[in-house]
């Protein structure tokens, strides 16, 4: 079941837990996966889930429509994406982990899904804030192994140079050449 935003939803930063939460009702809260070090604001606040938030929520849900996620997984990724767009501070690209595929002509679109390739694996990301040279992304794969010791889990937020983004439709052909 897909959750539908309503006027009671509120973003809350819990100083004690150092966590951003989405208060969905009196007895249900969603803990956002964005780590405190990536948040722009780290003091207590409460803010309504806005119309812009709802618009992003439904746009991202639509963009993930063709992917084989369960409804809870889809909602989790999308809520984390909306929170990241709204509350993350500017991130530095860590593109050195990813192979340069240089297959993108132009700027990626909001919600567009791309594959990325590292020395260890490949995975999929969704654009949550497009840029002309680099874009803010959310990991939609279960995980992306960056090196022997570091990986990004699903719903992790990262900034990538656009030259690292492999159009999703071209990924199968590109990856078969690597094998």
UniProtKB/Swiss-Prot annotation:
Its main location: cytoplasm. GO terms for biological process: division septum assembly; FtsZ-dependent cytokinesis. It is found in: Cytoplasm. GO terms for cellular component: cytoplasm. Keywords: Cell cycle, Cell division, Cytoplasm, Septation. The keyword Lipoprotein does not apply. HAMAP family: ZapC (MF_00906). Belongs to the ZapC family. Contributes to the efficiency of the cell division process by stabilizing the polymeric form of the cell division protein FtsZ. Acts by promoting interactions between FtsZ protofilaments and suppressing the GTPase activity of FtsZ. Interacts directly with FtsZ. This is Cell division protein ZapC.
């Amino acid at each position: 079941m897909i959750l539908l935003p309503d006027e009671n939803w509120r973003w809350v930063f819990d100083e004690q837990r150092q966590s951003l939460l989405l208060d969905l009702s009196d007895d249900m809260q969603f803990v956002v996966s964005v780590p405190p070090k990536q948040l722009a604001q780290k003091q207590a606040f409460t803010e309504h889930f806005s119309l812009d938030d709802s618009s992003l929520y439904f746009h991202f849900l639509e963009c993930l429509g063709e992917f084989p996620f369960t409804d809870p997984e889809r909602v989790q990724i999308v809520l984390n994406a909306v929170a990241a767009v709204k509350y993350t501070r500017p991130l530095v690209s860590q593109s050195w982990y990813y192979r340069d595929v240089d297959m993108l002509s132009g700027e990626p679109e909001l919600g567009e899904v791309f594959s990325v390739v590292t020395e260890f694996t490949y995975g999929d990301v969704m654009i949550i804030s497009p840029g002309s040279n680099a874009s803010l992304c959310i990991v939609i794969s279960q995980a992306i192994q960056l090196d022997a010791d570091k990986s990004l889990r699903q719903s992790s937020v990262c900034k990538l140079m656009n030259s690292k983004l492999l159009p999703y439709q071209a990924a199968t052909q590109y990856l078969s050449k690597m094998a």
